[in-house]
A protein has these predicted regions:
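C-terminal substrate-binding subdomain of Rossmann-fold SDR/epimerase-dehydratase oxidoreductases
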Residues: 22-148
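Short, conserved clusters of charged catalytic residues that mark active-site
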Residues: 2, 15-16, 115, 127
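Flexible, glycine-rich beta-alpha linker
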Residues: 1-15, 39
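Conserved catalytic helix of short-chain dehydrogenase/reductases
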Residues: 19
Length: 148
């Protein structure tokens, strides 16, 4: 299973969601790489959990009959979101503007990621559904409650 840019409550403090939210909340600059020309397939953690659960409940016997002892599935929202739009959602939910520190792209990074979930939909009738606006709202609500 390949997960794409997972975010949500209890996320790692070294990941973008926490770093951006915490910086904006505390009036610190947000480091924005590639001068904001980045896109990511942001996937809410609840969708990842549901995807893993759905796959684990799938029929092992059916896969064995097909000779499929392993298969690769992407779990992602199936849509790239501009990094600056993601930051705007955080700003909206915190009711604060971000101080953006525009930086060059980091070595080895890519400008865009996107999860093709066609196999997941075909084999398991599952597609992550949490839109970024909804997921960011849930995350910021959790953050404000947890760090009050």
């Amino acid at each position: 299973l390949r997960f794409f840019t997972v975010y949500g409550p209890w996320g790692r403090p070294d990941m973008a969601m926490f770093l951006f939210t915490d910086a904006i909340y505390h009036n610190r600059p947000v480091k924005v790489f590639n001068h904001g020309k980045m896109e990511r397939d942001f996937t809410f953690v609840d969708d990842i959990v549901k995807g893993v659960d759905t796959i684990l409940k799938g029929s092992l016997d059916q896969r064995k009959e097909k000779g499929e002892f392993y298969k690769l599935y992407n779990i992602g929202y199936n849509k790239s979101i501009k990094l600056l739009d993601f930051i705007k959602e955080i700003e909206l939910n915190l009711n604060k503007g971000a101080q953006k520190e525009m930086l060059p792209i980091q070595p080895g990074d890519v400008e865009k990621t996107w999860a093709n979930v066609d196999a997941l939909i075909r084999d398991y009738k599952y597609k992550p559904e949490t839109a970024v606006a909804e997921g960011v709202k849930k995350y910021v609500s959790w953050y404000l409650d947890y760090y009050k």
